[in-house]
């Protein structure tokens, strides 16, 4: 009997240790202090991290998207967030963009690194920037589809690899682990309980497109 109880304790301990308590803490900060709605993402396939744990064998964002629950379940409720990450302690943190939460503009990592270096030299103020091994995302104020359409229409050229994460979209937040690798803050939010400051989408798109043009990032790199 003691042997059975000891074995059960070891199994329970192993399950708890397999989780990452910093994910729960980060999810609670985002949801309750910043009031940004989050939900757990589908994790990468444990048999191969480049593959997704969802049923789609050709998933293009492995381990970096919502699946069950769906995106509409995103919430700022502390009890729900705690329940999710207690039961799925290694799940990526997915931010539902738009509405009362920030939106995002993302671009390939190499191009983003060059663009941010130029914007730094210009002393442009940026909000938080999320980095994965393949793409970086600049958080911006919420925008409407109409606003985005007018902004892009006014441009002579917009790199095709720019992605816009608005209402109904999502991004993975640090310290998530996805199929492409670790998600981290390239520009972390300033410490404090208030929601992080984010710039207008117009300022970011104008600056990023101009920076990419001036740094000579070619279409294949984008």
Model-predicted segments: where are they?
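Conserved phosphate/metal-binding and DNA-contacting active-site motifs used
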Residues: 1-135, 139-222
């Amino acid at each position: 009997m003691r042997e059975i109880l000891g074995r059960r304790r070891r199994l329970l301990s192993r399950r708890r240790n397999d989780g990452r308590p910093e994910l729960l803490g980060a999810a609670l900060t985002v949801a309750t202090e910043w009031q940004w709605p989050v939900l757990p993402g589908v994790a990468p396939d444990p048999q191969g991290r480049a593959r997704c744990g969802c049923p789609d064998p050709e998933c293009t964002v492995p381990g970096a998207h919502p699946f069950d629950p769906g995106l509409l379940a995103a919430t700022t409720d502390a009890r729900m967030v705690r329940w999710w990450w207690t039961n799925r302690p290694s799940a990526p943190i997915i931010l539902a963009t738009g509405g009362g939460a920030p939106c995002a503009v993302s671009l390939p990592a190499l191009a983003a690194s060059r663009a941010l270096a130029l914007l730094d030299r210009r002393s442009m103020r940026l909000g938080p920037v999320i980095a994965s091994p393949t793409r970086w995302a600049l958080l911006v104020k919420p925008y409407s589809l109409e606003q985005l359409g007018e902004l892009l229409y006014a441009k002579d050229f917009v790199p095709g690899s720019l992605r816009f994460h608005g209402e109904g979209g999502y991004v993975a937040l640090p310290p998530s682990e996805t199929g492409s690798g670790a998600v981290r803050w390239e520009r972390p939010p300033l410490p404090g309980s208030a929601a992080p400051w984010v710039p207008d989408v117009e300022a970011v798109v104008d600056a990023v497109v101009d920076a990419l043009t001036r740094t000579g990032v070619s279409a294949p790199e984008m």
